[in-house]
Structure formats: structure tokens, C-alpha cells
Amino acid sequence: MLAGCAGVKVTAVSNDDYLTLRRGDVLTTGNLGTSSIAALQVVGSDEKGCLAQFLACRNALENTTGLDDEQRLSALAELWLKEAQDGRNSMAPQSRTDAYLESARYAYAYLFLTARLPGQRALEDRQTQVRDYYNFSVQQALTEVFERYHGHPPSP
């Protein structure tokens, strides 16, 4: 019979640190979250390399068999959102709007078109993150379109 003892030290964590640890993603820190970084590692990339070669990285994520649909779609939603946010000052307005819409598209697919229903992952942090990507991306895209046309759509 083995006997042992363990000591545990408990320390307080600030609200900011807690949120960063639990929620650290493109919306809260400006960097990709751990789930997306893990997905990138499956395709042999990292955040910096992926953003430098966005098209190749995106294609690798879309076509890999090493990720399930939820991992792939949530990572793509976050990547497109990062692309849109990083391009605020350098991207053409239409390209930035397109990036927000791509983020919303992948987030919607994650939320409603994967094998598990939203209720089956209701308490998962990743679903909350992806839902926020969807809401934020749609809001930004609509705001940009409205500002671009000031309520007057382009003629066909």
C-alpha cells in the first residue's frame, strides 16, 4: 500500500487574467485562441506563419483530414476575423467586409451545420467564442456597408 500527501497552494486570479486564460482569443487579446492555435499545429503552422501565408494556411485548414468539422470551422471563423481586424487600416473596405462575412459564414456553419446541435455543447467555452465571432462579424460587416453607402445602395 502506498501512502502520500500533496500540498496545494491557492492564489487569487484577477478578472483580466481569468478571462485571458479562459477566453483568450482574437476578440479579447487580439491573438488567436488556444483552440485555433492547436488546429494550426495539426496542419503544421503557427499563428505568425499562417497570417503571413493566409491563403495557403486557409486552404490547409479547409482540406485537412486531421481536424473534425467543429475544429476546422471554428478556427476558420477566428482566422477570418483576425484577418479583418488586422486589415482595418490596410485592407480595401470591400475586402475587409468580405473577411468579416467569411468569419460569420464559418461561425454560422460551426453553430448550426455540424453534427452536434448547439444545445449539446451549450456549456462549452468554444461555442460562446464562436457565437461572439458571428455576432461581432455581422455587426462590423453591416456597419461598414451602411457607412460606405450612407443608406443609399449602389445602383445595379
Feature map (PLM): residue ranges:
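N-terminal alpha-helical interaction modules that lie
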Residues: A6-R88, Q94-A141, Y149
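Long, low-hydrophobicity ectodomains and other hydrophilic envelope-associated domains
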Residues: E147-P156
